[in-house]
Amino acid sequence: MPRSQRNDNFIDKTFTVMADLILKVLPTSSQSKTAFAYYRDGMSAQADGEYAEALENYQAALELEEDPTDRSYILYNIGLIHASNGEHEKALEYYHQALELNPRMPQALNNIAVIYHYLGTQAEEQQRLEEAEQFFDRAADYWKRAIQLAPNNYIEAQNWLKTTGRSNIDVYF
C-alpha cells in the first residue's frame, strides 16, 4: 500500500488529499503524475526517518520523471539522505547531479559547502593542514555561489567567509 494511503498524521493526510486533487486536474501525463506520487511518498518517508523506503520511492520517481527541474529535486533529496547517513561522497555525487540539471539551486550549493567544511574540520583535527585548507577553500567557493543566488540566506556562511578572510565582498545582502 502506498505510504500516502496509510498516513496517520492529519496534516500529511490533508496534504496528500490536496496533492491528489491537484494531480487529477493538472494537464500532465500519467507518467508524470505517477512520478510525483513516488516523490511525495519519498518525502513522507524521509520526514519519518524511513530512509530506505524514501530512497526506493525516489529511485522510482527518477525512472519516470522527465522534467530536469523535478529530477534535480529528487536527486537533491537523495543527497540529503546520504548526507544524513554520513555518506559524504555519495551525497556530493547526488548534489552535483542536481546542480547539473538545475544550476540555480542554492540549497545544493550550500550542502556541498557544508560537507567540504566538515571534511576540512576533520582534516584540521588530524593535523592535515594543507588538505584542510583545500577543503575550506572549496567550501568557500560553494558558499559564495549559494549566497549569490540567495543573498539573504546563509548568514553563518557569510560570517565564516568574512572571519576566515575568504570573502571578497563586504556585504552580500
Swiss-Prot record:
Subcellular location: Cellular thylakoid membrane
UniProt protein name: Photosystem I assembly protein Ycf3
Annotated membrane topology: Peripheral membrane protein
Purpose: Essential for the assembly of the photosystem I (PSI) complex. May act as a chaperone-like factor to guide the assembly of the PSI subunits.
One GO term of the biological process aspect: photosynthesis
Organism of provenance: Thermosynechococcus vestitus (strain NIES-2133 / IAM M-273 / BP-1)
InterPro entries: PSI_Ycf3_assembly, TPR-like_helical_dom_sf, TPR_rpt, Ycf3/AcsC/BcsC/TPR_MFPF
GO CC term (a single one): plasma membrane-derived thylakoid membrane
Phylogenetic lineage: Bacteria, Bacillati, Cyanobacteriota, Cyanophyceae, Acaryochloridales
